[in-house]
Every structure is written in structure tokens, then in C-alpha cells.
Amino acid sequence: VIVAYRHEDGTVEEVSAGDLSALEAAAVEDVLGSTWQEIEQRLREKDPTAMRAIIWAGRRREDADLDFATFDLPQAGRRLRVGYERYEIDDILTAVLESSLAKSEDASMELAQQHLRNSAYRRSDVDAALEALGKGHLARRRPASED
């Protein structure tokens, strides 16, 4: 997932949890007292402390001594955002498609794409993933401003 923080000046800081190194991920586990699987779940649930930890890990690339206990993100409730990345959307849709084909069901694909539209970092990634799977008829044509 990508965690983004919008600064007061409007600039957006993005950190991909998937791009963290093993040591960075371990540091996040340590400060949160959670396993990586638990952290991923917390991110899916939009837990602000987990999102703060991902931004903290990204910032530690420039400031290795940055202390998590005092690391704050003003107005985090309004300025933090989390969403699936394209590769995650591809993985989810592929798994749902395979399951749907095995069971001759279309409903699960519809539900999955609705969930992904609400959870994707970039909504256009859902349409692109559907197109790539040959399910372009499920793609919504949205203006780029809705991304």
C-alpha cells in the first residue's frame, strides 16, 4: 500500500510500504510491537498509527535518528491517506477472477472491483487492471480528476 501525507503547503509525501527495505520493515514492526502481517492489516483498516509508522520509516532515510515516540503528523486524520498499489490490485483481481471462473460466478468480481475502487490509491489503477485481465467492460470511465 501507499501511505500519503498532505503537508500544509499542499505537497504530498508518499511512502510505499512495499518498497521498504527489510530493515525498515523490521523497525516499523519494532515501534508498533506488531508483525508485518498485523501491520498490513492495520494499514488496510486505515489505522493512523500504522500509517504514521510508514511515513516515519520513509523519513528515517534522511534522518536515521528520528524518534518514533515524538514523530508527529499534524492533522493526521485529514491529511493521511492509504490505498492499494497497482500490483496489489492486479494480485487481488487475478485471484478473484480465478476463483470466479472456477465457480462460474460473476458476483465476486463485481464485489471485488467495487471494494478496490474504494481502497485503491489511484482509482484509475483498478480500471487498468481490469483492462489487463480482459475485463474492461467492468471498468468505469472516470475523469482523471477523480484519481
Residues of each region from the PLM?
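Charged interaction scaffolds used for protein-protein
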Residues: V1-E14, D19-W56, R60-D147
